[in-house]
Amino acid sequence: MEVILLERIGRLGQMGETVKVKDGYARNFLLPQGKALRANEANKKKFEGQRAQLEAQNLERKNEAQAVAEKLNGESFIVVRSAGETGQLYGSVSTRDIADIISANGFTLHRNQVELNHPIKAIGLHEVSISLHPEVQVQVTVNIARSTEEAERQAKGEDLTSIEAIYGIEEQPLSEEVFDEEDEAEDQA
């Protein structure tokens, strides 16, 4: 099916372009959400009449998104989750969790704006891309840790999956003298 795009859609085209898409994608997503019109003569005339208004609305949304992007870009958000000793989470952190944390910090964000290729399943610092508008994207850091204290240590660059971080001990072997003394004690017994 051919449709006229009413806004820029990633991997599809710019506003005003006529593109061919699968029927199901057009009927179930583009047309119901008002992102496109069927490409026929009546709709082409209708679009040309509304083009200036649609471009003005798009520019306004883009400017709002850029204002939010200036505040949000480079921010760091802490997510506290329970995890095993090796840093593997019991569960995962999904787009919904990230959107909820960012929204709790005063930003309006929907989970479909968070771009995450796969759920996060380990503690650490993770870069996440947020799409505020088809033309405006920002990067935020999500700090996933077992506690806020660990999150602060992680933010300073400490690796919390090492043995020292897990058990609070240094990884130095015992000297040979300790073993010699134990052997002598066993021989005397």
Swiss-Prot record:
PROSITE patterns: RIBOSOMAL_L9 (PS00651). One of its GO terms (molecular function) is rRNA binding. Keywords: Ribonucleoprotein, Ribosomal protein, RNA-binding, rRNA-binding. InterPro entries: Ribosomal_bL9, Ribosomal_bL9/RNase_H1_N, Ribosomal_bL9_bac/chp, Ribosomal_bL9_C, Ribosomal_bL9_C_sf, Ribosomal_bL9_N, Ribosomal_bL9_N_sf. It holds the Pfam family Ribosomal_L9_C. The keyword Ribonucleoprotein applies. One of its GO terms (biological process) is translation. Binds to the 23S rRNA. HAMAP family: Ribosomal_bL9. Belongs to the bacterial ribosomal protein bL9 family. This is Large ribosomal subunit protein bL9. It comes from Brucella anthropi (strain ATCC 49188 / DSM 6882 / CCUG 24695 / JCM 21032 / LMG 3331 / NBRC 15819 / NCTC 12168 / Alc 37).
